[in-house]
Structure formats: structure tokens, C-alpha cells
A protein has these predicted regions:
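C-terminal catalytic "cap/lid" subdomain
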Residues: 1-236
Length: 236
């Protein structure tokens, strides 16, 4: 099957790397997720990845800590997860390059659009750590920003739910799943796709988002080939 997308930006939540516990690294889960990424990469698509830091740190659970400091710790957590995903993919025979938004040359080079594009054109998976480098911005916003910067065709948001619903499907059995949505509806109805900053950035730059379930990592390859997976959010 032909590729529907030539270049994607994939967001993986930090909690996903922790398996059922949602913390640290769960080896079988890491194997499965990175195996799914490898399968998609072997189809010929160029891939960039942003990994959240929630398996180690969540700023909203930081108690009385000052917000900017809590967010800085969260940024460092995303760097740890970026390095872990890179290592796992390399073990599977996939070349990667990690870039950070925070200057730490002993760990990884700083992000530039030119270097990220070069890496992907060299058939490497580009992995972005450190968030945007600024507090108050989510890793969803980081993913949207990097996707726009590298001219990705689409942003993939891999979650633990098989798409976007009108209400929480874990709490409400009658929740309705959307196959497609417009950014206008997402923003007006405040649907739980991503934060408003990220959604607005995608809308303004006409960057579609595909939200799908990472419980089956093969969904990444299916989505790249245009199969009906998850919920597609676009500017209608």
C-alpha cells in the first residue's frame, strides 16, 4: 500500500513508556512501541518524535513548587525519555538522532530545523527532547511546533484511547467517538484532544492531527498508509 504521508511528527506520552504502571520504563512496552515505530519507518516515511516526560514528572502534581521550576524539571524528564527511546530504536537497528531545546552539548545537539531535516533525509528518526525550552508550554505544543518547523504532513498523537470522544469513554459508556473533527469544533467544545495553544497552532498552520490508540503499536504503520485509524482533526 502506498504511503499517505511522507513525513510525520509522532507524539508519544511519557506514561506510555511506563506500561501499566505509567512510571519509569517498562521494557516489554518499550519494545512494542519502538517496534511499531520501526515498522512504520521501514515503509519509507520520515519520522520525528516528541516524547512526554510524564513517566518521571508531572508539573501539575508538583505541589507548592514554583511553576517555572516544575516545568524545567519536566523538560529534563522529556530529555531522559528521548534518550531512552533513541537507545531502544538503535537496539532494533534504526538510526536516530536526538535534539534538545535546552543547551546540553554533552548529552545531545541543540535543535535546529536544518539539522532535524538533514537527519530525517538521511533516513534517521529525529527525536526531540526538552519541550519548547520554555515553561508553560506542553509537549503537545512542542509536537505541533516541531511539526510545523520541519514541514510535516501531519501530527500523530498516540494515546491510550482509540480516538476523540465527546466525553470520557472510561467514565461514560455512551460516549460518542468522532471519526473526523474540525479544529473549530475542538476549540469551541473544548474537546480533550490537546491544549488550546497546540490546537490553535495546528489550525493556523493547516496541520492535521490524527489521534489514535498506541495500545496496538501497529496503528502507526496503518495510519501512515491511510487506513481508518482513530480520529482525524483538520481545518474544515
Amino acid at each position: 500500500m502506498a504511503l499517505k504521508y511522507q513525513r510525520i511528527l509522532l507524539k508519544i506520552s511519557g506514561e506510555a513508556l511506563g506500561g501499566e504502571k505509567g512510571t519509569g520504563f517498562d521494557e516489554p512496552t518499550m519494545d512494542a512501541i519502538c517496534g511499531g515505530v520501526k515498522k512504520a519507518h521501514e515503509l519509507g516515511v520520515q519520522i520525528g518524535i516528541v516524547v512526554g516526560g510524564g513517566s518521571f514528572w508531572r508539573g501539575r502534581s508538583s505541589g507548592k513548587m514554583e511553576r517555572t521550576l516544575a516545568d524545567k524539571i519536566g523538560m529534563l524528564a522529556t530529555v531522559m525519555n528521548a534518550l531512552a527511546v533513541s537507545d531502544k530504536l538503535e537496539q532494533l537497528g534504526v538510526q536516530t538522532e536526538v535534539f534538545t531545546s535546552i543547551t546540553m552539548p554533552q548529552v545531545a545537539p541543540a535543535f535546529t530545523r536544518k539539522d532535524a531535516l538533514r537527519a530525517m533525509e538521511e533516513d534517521k528518526i529525529a527525536i526531540f527532547g526538552g519541550g519548547t525550552g520554555n515553561p508553560f508550554f506542553s509537549t503537545d505544543t512542542t509536537t505541533a511546533l516541531r511539526a510545523v518547523e520541519v514541514s510535516a504532513d501531519i501530527m500523530f498523537k498516540a494515546t491510550m484511547v482509540d480516538g476523540v470522544y465527546d466525553k470520557d469513554p472510561h467514565k461514560y459508556p455512551d460516549a460518542k467517538k468522532y471519526d473526523t473533527l474540525t479544529f473549530t469544533k475542538v476549540l469551541e467544545d473544548r474537546l480533550a484532544v490537546m491544549d488550546g495553544t497546540a490546537a490553535t497552532l495546528c489550525r493556523d498552520n493547516k496541520l492535521p492531527i490524527l489521534v489514535f490508540d498506541l495500545a496496538d503499536p501497529d496503528n502507526i504503520a496503518r495510519a501512515v498508509q491511510g487506513e481508518n485509524v482513530g480520529t482525524l482533526v483538520y481545518e474544515g
